Amino acid sequence: MRNSRFCAILAVISAISVSYVLAQRSQQSVIADLGKLIVDNCPPMLCTGLDCAVVTERNGCQLCACPIGSPSRGCDPMPFILWHDLIVNGCPNVTLNSRDPAQKVHRWFRRVNRFTNTDQCEPYIFPYCPELDFNLWRSPRTKQECELYCYSIDEQRKRGII
């Protein structure tokens, strides 16, 4: 009796472990697929975020690499191709292999317009997906966060932010 209970518990633990590993692999796969969507469409990026650097992909596309989880990633607006995919199709649900509606929230980005000579943080409608927020496209949640992460220390001083 004890052995059968032990085996049943072990089977449940094994099933949960396998599900967790598959979900992790699946989430990484979804993030990689969405990342590939960005690279394939090669959107223009200013890469103004703190601690970010321009990197060149194999196809020649220049993208902005920022620390994982940093709101600096979102100093550029989300590329339209990714924004549209998440707004229209929703957030990938890796555990059910489906899509859930994206929550529409306000996020901030740095808009630099060389024609009108303006440079400021502006809000936009952002498709929030909890599973993608940290790993793929985290964006500043407030104007203050945008100013902190999207302007250098010198720019912040000139603007009177600090």
From Swiss-Prot:
A single Gene Ontology CC term: extracellular space
Keyword set, alphabetical order: Secreted, Signal
Signal peptide limits: 1-23
Subcellular location as annotated: Secreted
Keyword Protein biosynthesis: no
Pfam families from the UniProt entry: BPTI_nem
Deletion consequences: Mutants display an increased body growth rate during larval development and male tail morphological defects characterized by thickening of the male rays, with rays 5 and 6 the most severely affected in most cases. RNAi-mediated knockdown results in increased body length.
GO BP terms in the entry: negative regulation of multicellular organism growth; nematode male tail tip morphogenesis
Main subcellular location of this protein, as a coarse class: secreted
Keyword check for Calcium: no
Function per UniProt: Secreted protein that is involved in larval elongation, early adult growth and male tail development.
Full protein name: Protein lon-8
Organism: Caenorhabditis elegans
UniProt gene name: lon-8
